[in-house]
Regions:
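PLP-dependent aspartate aminotransferase-fold enzymes
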Residues: 102-221
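Active-site and channel-lining beta-strand-loop segments
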Residues: 35-57
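Glycine-rich loop-to-alpha-helix module at the N-terminal edge of alpha/beta enzyme cores
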Residues: 5-8, 12, 53-143
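Active-site-adjacent loop/helix segments that line or gate small-molecule/cofactor pockets in enzymes
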Residues: 1-42, 92, 97, 201
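Conserved PLP phosphate-binding loop immediately N-terminal to the Schiff-base lysine helix
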Residues: 225-229
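Short beta-strand-to-turn element immediately C-terminal to the catalytic PLP-Schiff-base lysine
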Residues: 47-48, 66-68, 158-160
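Conserved active-site and cofactor/substrate-binding residues in soluble primary-metabolism enzymes
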Residues: 13, 17, 41, 68, ...
Length: 229
């Protein structure tokens, strides 16, 4: 099959009906950029409830690195569900959690061994990083970048600077967070080209933040996305 294969107008009638039901009972705070109602997916192909087929070029929301419904992942989920469905790793011990932490520790390129903190989402991971950075360094400040998305909980939202709608109405935010221009040469925030760039984004941190708002010794962490989301 050649994808995409579109059989109806978008969204189709079944999708429209479900979206209307959703609007009546689900929080409007969710970000739904596309009127897509998925019925099933496999690999990189996605089928909606009206039978339209799409090619997923974004791995879901950039989290399905093995594709949709990879057989090995499905088997692992079924196997775990047959053993038990919930076990709080913060309260009890679990062999699979230990094995995963051991495998991660073997991959992390740091000296002295590594320890893992498991979370349910990227937002929770960012919250944990904020706490860890401040706890370990004893420093208050964090540098993030314009255009970055780090979550919508109150701590992570202080770092997020992607869209005004994500922050509107929730301030004041956690203090100690400072934003700088993100070094995106494709869409340079100061209008330069790679051949005439003199690292102005880094200069902003050194010559603006560090000269006017804080010293480097007050920085607990720099939070950056290799590819902004």
């Amino acid at each position: 099959m050649t994808l995409p294969d579109i059989k109806t107008s978008l969204p189709g009638p079944k999708a429209k009906a479900l979206i209307e039901r959703d609007a009546a009972v689900v929080s409007p705070s969710y970000t739904r950029g596309y009127p897509l109602v998925i019925k099933r997916a496999s690999g990189a192909s996605v089928e909606d409830v009206d039978g339209n087929m799409f090619l997923d070029c974004a791995a879901g929301i950039a989290v399905n690195s093995t594709g949709h419904s990879h057989p090995d992942v499905v088997r692992a989920i079924i196997d775990q569900a047959q053993r038990f469905l919930h076990m709080s790793g913060t309260d009890f011990y679990y062999d699979v959690q230990v094995r995963l932490a051991e495998e991660l520790a073997a991959l992390v390129p740091i000296d002295g061994g590594a320890r893992s903190f498991f979370a349910n989402s990227g937002t929770e991971a960012v919250e944990a990083c904020i706490k860890l950075a401040r706890y370990a360094t004893g420093r208050p400040n964090i540098i993030a970048f314009f255009g970055g998305f780090h979550g919508r909980t109150l701590g992570s939202l202080a770092l997020t600077a992607s869209k005004p709608v994500q922050r509107r109405g929730f301030g004041p935010f956690m203090p100690g967070v400072f934003h700088a221009p993100y070094a995106d040469c494709y869409r340079c925030p100061v209008g330069l080209k790679p051949d005439n760039c003199a690292a102005e984004c880094l200069d902003f941190i050194e010559h603006q933040l560090f000269m006017h708002l804080m010293t480097p010794e007050e920085v607990a962490a720099v939070v950056i996305e290799p590819i902004q989301g």
